[in-house]
């Protein structure tokens, strides 16, 4: 809805930001949090994004030398009454502790009844780590982790279902880039 207060986590270069901000710019609020350096320099304050705000600027995401996944240090998102928190294709970048921190601050940022929406690349259920699946994550694992943070699982969408993706190749391979199977999950804060 155009009157929502939304928080986008890890917006990268702002591909989704450019879709979200115009929807809420007049009647709602848009906040970007965690890993916002690229959009804060190139997008925030520009035409069409004048009212968009950066929050949780003191948060840090980093990968220790030799580590497969990122860690997250944050004291919160700086918002406590959001209608929706969204994150697109980056849940897989974090290890269990980083994902737990992301889920906790998302829970804390939402008002009761608020929506937590997560989209990421599909990994086969219970498949171990390897070089080809490091940027994929098991949706069942994600559901369990997000529920453990206090959320209630509401629904999933098949919007990004790609039956031709064999779930065996790195998402950056030319043969699958842009055509990966992705899961889209919706949770609510009770």
How would you describe each model-predicted region?
Residues 149, 164-190:
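Core SAM-dependent methyltransferase catalytic element
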Residues 2-12:
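Conserved class I S-adenosyl-L-methionine
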Residues 31, 113-125:
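Conserved beta-strand signature within the Rossmann-like core of class I S-adenosyl-L-methionine
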Residues 2-3, 26-27, 110-116:
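Short glycine-dipeptide loop
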Residues 129-156:
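Conserved Class I S-adenosyl-L-methionine
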Residues 75-85:
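A short acidic, Gly/Pro-enriched loop at the edge of an enzyme's catalytic core
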Residues 69-72, 93-106:
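A short, conserved alpha-helix within the catalytic core of class I
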Residues 21-22, 100-113:
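A short glycine-rich, Lys/Arg-flanked "PGG" loop and its adjoining helix->strand segment in the class I
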């Amino acid at each position: 809805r155009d009157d929502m207060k939304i928080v986008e986590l890890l917006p990268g270069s702002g591909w989704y930001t450019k879709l979200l901000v115009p929807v809420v710019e007049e009647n709602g609020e848009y906040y970007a949090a965690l890993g916002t350096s690229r959009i804060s320099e190139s997008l925030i304050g520009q035409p069409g994004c004048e009212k968009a705000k950066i929050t949780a600027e003191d948060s840090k995401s980093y990968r220790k030398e030799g580590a497969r996944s990122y860690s997250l240090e944050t004291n919160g998102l700086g918002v406590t009454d959001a209608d929706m928190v969204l994150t697109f294709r980056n849940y897989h970048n974090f290890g269990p502790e980083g994902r737990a921190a992301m889920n906790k601050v998302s829970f804390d940022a939402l008002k009761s009844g608020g929506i937590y929406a997560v989209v990421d690349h599909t990994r086969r259920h219970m498949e171990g780590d390897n070089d080809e699946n490091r940027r994929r994550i098991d949706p069942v694992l994600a559901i369990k982790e997000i529920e453990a943070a206090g959320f209630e699982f509401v629904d999933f969408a098949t919007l990004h279902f790609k039956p031709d993706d064999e779930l065996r190749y790195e998402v950056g391979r030319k043969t699958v880039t842009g055509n990966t199977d992705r899961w889209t999950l919706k949770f609510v804060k009770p």
